[in-house]
Amino acid sequence: MINTEQSHTKHWVTSSLLDIEIDCLGRQAALKLIEDTLNDHQTQPRAQALQIVTMNAEMVYAATQDPALLSLLQQAEVVLPDGIGVVWALERQGVSVERVPGIDLVKALLQKPLKIA
C-alpha cells in the first residue's frame, strides 16, 4: 500500500511500501542531506547520527518474513529506493521516484574533499 504524504518529521515526500516508509529523495537531495549531516557533526560533535538504508526488493521481501528486519527498516531515518523493483512497485502505485543506488552515493561522497575541523 502506498500513501504519498509530507512526513511530519521530514521536509520531503515519503511513501509507504508494505509498512516501510520510503523517502522520495533524488540522488542530489540525498547527497545534500548526507553532507549537511556530516557538516553538523563537524560543528556539533553530539549531533544526531543518520541511519540510511538503500533498499531493494529482496530487503522488502525479507522484512515480510523477519519482524526484526522490518523493525530496523521502520526505524531508519532515511530509506532510499535502491533497487529497480522498489522503484517499479512505487511507480505502479502512482509514485514517481528516482532510483538512488547506495554505491553511487558512496562513490559521490568519496569524491568530495575531506574537511577536518
Task: Cite the ranges covered by each PLM segment.
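N-terminal nucleotide/polyanion-binding subdomain common to many enzyme families
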Residues: 2-99, 103-107
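An alpha-beta-alpha
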Residues: 114-117
